[in-house]
Swiss-Prot record:
Molecular function via GO: ATP binding; metal ion binding; oxaloacetate decarboxylase activity; pyruvate carboxylase activity
Gene: pycB
Organism: Methanothermobacter thermautotrophicus (strain ATCC 29096 / DSM 1053 / JCM 10044 / NBRC 100330 / Delta H)
Domain of life: Archaea
Protein name: Pyruvate carboxylase subunit B
UniProt domain Biotinyl-binding: residue ranges: 493-568
EC number from the UniProt entry: 6.4.1.1
Keyword field contains Membrane: no
Length: 568
């Protein structure tokens, strides 16, 4: 048998899974040439959440990141994760945007396009696959792996046949939550090798603890490629350690042929990077969590879910959110939990828990999901929930992109009017993220500070522990024994109660004000849209009247309970 090829994920999925996608380009380029020497099948370095995080938190141009990496990586193909018709966003984009984005991605340095759809709806992948093939790139079609009564071995094999019919070069089993058991990995890989002529790539996270065993079972079944992460960025919600997998397969028919000495140097570099980012590294994302076999939360989502709950000052509700997620997933027809459905399901679970009433608050993305605008769910929707979310609306049954009008020229016009377009890629950035891109392109985004790790203990010897105290002429020796150190946080201000106030239901950014001062509105009208946890939330007025005062502006951040406007 031929040896196993390896995809290294340190530049994309590994830090997305453990560091909330916060790794800076300046911390990638110093080691990129060394990684290029290893002989990986590819370096996954772009796509996924990296695009969003670059412009939202890091004040980095994601296109420039791609170009810089390509300058350092000459031999190893650079791979990106592309969400089919969603590209690197959270909704469907029209075909003209998809074409331009893929063409520019290839032009700037992407060699391998790993293309998936969160619902395994082939209609949402066809056009992206077609355009990527036109670039003569390596096109890898993806099966999003999950477990439900509707996801069977036969259904996965049938889907792989559809990908082969579209002339993909390889197929990836994308196990976002580390759910696949050794037995199931063997059976699925063997079936794909028997029923198709495609190279098979297994991509797993270590969340459940089973992944190294599943990798070896996949090798025995004939897998061609495995995804791994250099050890300081491995385990937990990330992939298995590259060095461990290389060593485990050495002197077997599956030997990768990779040099552990070169990998050791790369490991040392990332050990320092891990220390640098230790304030972001969350213990929840690092640990093995067998509850994932119940909740099915993917690796990349765990660290982001923790970060988002922290933003809402609701980390104490984490367990409740985990328990709510399978219920929401069932209501929505058992979608695989991968972007964007992981965000859609996860944030709805957060809202159900924080609001105290299921589906009393619903994001626009959830409404669109029930309308069929993300594609065909694997299973029937909960009809009662559907009525609560979209009323009597009938979902569409065509390819969602078929009802979208071309947007590229309009985005160009808007961007030029705003004076924010310097290159063609800026038009695409604006098209993908119209809420945040203008601020980024105007240079108004500040890089999120990377805080040093908190000191666990005060330096010894600097704080006196024995005091001589005189009381009414008598002297006493008092020993003070340290028992820990307290972090003092600012108290939360009490919310102001103003008559007629319309308040934000979530912490986030105001992306749209739908009324002006002096407008007449009715109870239930949508008066603003707040983007919270990357999803848009309509703010409805609980009462009618005239808009007396607006206290915020588009692009400004608001906290939960902040007054957006007063209507009397």
């Amino acid at each position: 048998m031929k040896g196993i090829k390896v995809v290294e994920t340190a530049f994309r999925d590994a830090h997305q899974s453990l560091l909330a996608t916060r790794l800076r380009t300046r911390d990638m380029t110093p080691i990129a040439e060394e990684m290029d020497r290893v002989g990986f099948f590819s370096l996954e370095a772009w796509g996924g959440a990296t695009f969003d995080t670059c412009i939202r938190y890091l004040n980095e141009d994601p296109w420039e990141r791609l170009r810089e990496l390509k300058e350092h990586v000459k031999r190893t193909p650079i791979q990106m994760l592309l969400r089919g018709q969603n590209l690197v966003g959270y909704k469907h984009y029209p075909d003209d945007i998809v074409r331009k984005f893929i063409e520019k991605s290839y032009e700037n340095g992407v060699d391998v396009f790993r293309i998936f759809d969160a619902l395994n709806d082939i209609r949402n992948m066809e056009y992206a696959i077609k355009v990527a093939r036109e670039q003569e790139a390596h096109v890898q079609g993806v099966i999003c792996y999950t477990i439900s009564p509707y996801h069977t071995l036969e259904s996965y094999v049938d889907f792989a046949r559809e990908l082969e019919a579209l002339e993909c070069d390889s197929v990836a089993i994308k196990d976002m939550a580390g759910l696949i058991s050794p037995h199931d990995a063997y059976e699925l890989v063997r079936a794909l090798k028997e029923e198709t002529d495609l190279m098979v790539n297994l991509h797993c996270h270590c969340t459940s603890g089973m992944t190294p065993m599943s990798y070896y079972a996949a090798c025995e079944a004939g897998v061609d490629i495995l995804d791994t992460a250099i050890s300081p960025l491995s385990w937990g919600a990330s992939q298995p350690p590259t060095e461990s997998i290389v060593a485990a397969l050495r002197d077997t028919p599956y030997d990768t042929g990779l040099d552990l000495e070169i990998l050791k140097n790369i490991k040392k570099y990332f050990e320092e990077i891990r220390k640098k980012y230790s304030s972001i590294l969350d213990p929840i994302a690092e640990q093995i969590d067998t509850d994932v076999l119940i909740y099915q939360i993917p690796g990349g989502m765990l660290s982001n879910l923790v970060a988002q709950l922290k933003e809402q000052n609701a980390l104490d509700r984490y367990e409740e959110v985990l328990e709510e997620m399978p219920r929401v997933r069932k209501d929505m027809g058992y979608p695989p939990l991968v972007t964007p459905t992981s965000q859609i399901v996860g944030i709805q679970a957060v809202m159900n828990v924080l609001s105290g009433e299921r589906y009393s608050m619903v994001t626009n993305e959830v409404k669109d999901y029930f309308r069929g605008l993300y594609g065909r769910p694997p299973a029937p929707l909960n009809e009662e929930v559907a009525r609560k979310v979209i009323g009597d609306e009938k979902p569409i049954d065509c390819r969602p992109a078929d009802i979208l009008k071309p947007q590229y020229d309009e985005c160009r016009r808007k961007g030029e009017e705003m004076g924010i377009i310097e290159k063609e890629e800026d038009i695409l950035t604006l098209a993908l993220y119209p809420a945040i891109a203008p601020k980024f392109l105007r240079g108004e985004i500040e890089e999120e500070p990377l805080e040093p790790p908190a000191e666990e203990m005060a330096p010894t010897g600097e704080v006196p522990t024995v005091f001589h105290v005189e009381v009414d002429g008598d002297e006493f020796e008092v020993k003070v024994v340290p028992t820990g150190y307290m972090t003092i946080e600012e108290a939360e201000p009490e919310p102001v109660d103003v008559e007629g106030a319309v308040k934000s239901t979530m912490q986030g950014m105001v992306v749209k004000l739908k009324v002006s001062e002096g407008d007449q509105v009715n109870a239930g009208d949508v008066v603003a849209v707040v983007e919270a946890m990357k999803m848009e939330n309509d703010i409805q007025t609980p009462h009618g009247g005239v808009v007396e005062k607006i206290y915020t502006a588009e692009g400004e951040k608001v906290e939960t309970g902040d007054i957006i406007m007063v209507i009397k």
